[in-house]
């Protein structure tokens, strides 16, 4: 007997990929980090500001200390593929959140295939992947907002299985 057909509304997909470079300082290094994100994504990055002053770190409130860019669609999948190649398709179980999203970091952006430029330098970055299913929009839309049912919500186990199957990857840990 043939295997039971999978419900197309239950299929997982990548909602968005957020690339983040957090330096903890503003100035020239931050603008160079923004150039790296622009080269990688083809989009203009947004700067994040410090929420409050921390004198020990030399950070003032509202000072720009990081930059990030949100990528969606096929471009997000292509950039994620390059990031996972750097990690050799190996993530730890603790990289996956209870809500089914996952994230990881890389040490050097040149591992992604970007040519090294001495005027820019080398930056590490974080990849955050937000997963969703068809029908999840009912919880986010403005009009006629609804709730996503318990059986339709995404958990870590769903995402880990999707990750292993799609990328033929390894998840380490218990």
Swiss-Prot record:
UniProt entry tagged with the keyword rRNA-binding: yes
Tell me if Hydrolase is a UniProt keyword of this record: no
Q: Where in the cell is it found?
A: Cytoplasm; Nucleus
Alphabetic keyword roster: Cytoplasm, Nucleus, Ribonucleoprotein, Ribosomal protein, RNA-binding, rRNA-binding
Please give the chief subcellular localization of this protein. Answer: cytoplasm
Can you cite an annotated GO cellular component?
cytosolic large ribosomal subunit
Q: Which family does it belong to?
A: Belongs to the universal ribosomal protein uL5 family.
Quaternary state and partners of this protein? Component of the large ribosomal subunit (LSU). Mature yeast ribosomes consist of a small (40S) and a large (60S) subunit. The 40S small subunit contains 1 molecule of ribosomal RNA (18S rRNA) and 33 different proteins (encoded by 57 genes). The large 60S subunit contains 3 rRNA molecules (25S, 5.8S and 5S rRNA) and 46 different proteins (encoded by 81 genes). Component of a hexameric 5S RNP precursor complex; this complex acts as a precursor for ribosome assembly. rpl11a/rpl11b/uL5 forms a heterotrimeric complex with rpl5a/rpl5b/uL18 and syo1.
Listed NCBIfam families: PRK04219.1 (NF003258)
What task does this protein carry out? Answer: Component of the ribosome, a large ribonucleoprotein complex responsible for the synthesis of proteins in the cell. The small ribosomal subunit (SSU) binds messenger RNAs (mRNAs) and translates the encoded message by selecting cognate aminoacyl-transfer RNA (tRNA) molecules. The large subunit (LSU) contains the ribosomal catalytic site termed the peptidyl transferase center (PTC), which catalyzes the formation of peptide bonds, thereby polymerizing the amino acids delivered by tRNAs into a polypeptide chain.
Protein's UniProt name: Large ribosomal subunit protein uL5A
């Amino acid at each position: 007997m043939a295997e039971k057909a999978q419900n197309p509304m239950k299929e997982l997909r990548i909602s968005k990929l957020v690339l983040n470079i957090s330096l903890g300082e503003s100035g020239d290094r931050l603008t160079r980090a923004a150039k790296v994100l622009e080269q990688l994504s083809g989009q203009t990055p947004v700067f994040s500001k410090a929420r409050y002053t921390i004198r020990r770190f030399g950070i003032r409130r509202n000072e720009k200390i990081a930059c990030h860019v949100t990528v969606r669609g096929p471009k997000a999948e292509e950039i994620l593929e390059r990031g996972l190649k750097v990690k050799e398709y190996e993530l730890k179980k603790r990289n996956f959140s209870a809500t089914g999203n996952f994230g990881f970091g890389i040490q050097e952006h040149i591992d992604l295939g970007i040519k090294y430029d001495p005027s820019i330098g080398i930056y590490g970055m974080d990849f955050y992947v937000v997963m969703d299913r068809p029908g999840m929009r009912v919880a986010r839309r403005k009009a006629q907002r609804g709730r996503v049912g318990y059986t339709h919500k995404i958990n870590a186990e769903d995402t880990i299985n999707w990750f292993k199957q799609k990328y033929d990857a390894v998840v380490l840990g218990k």
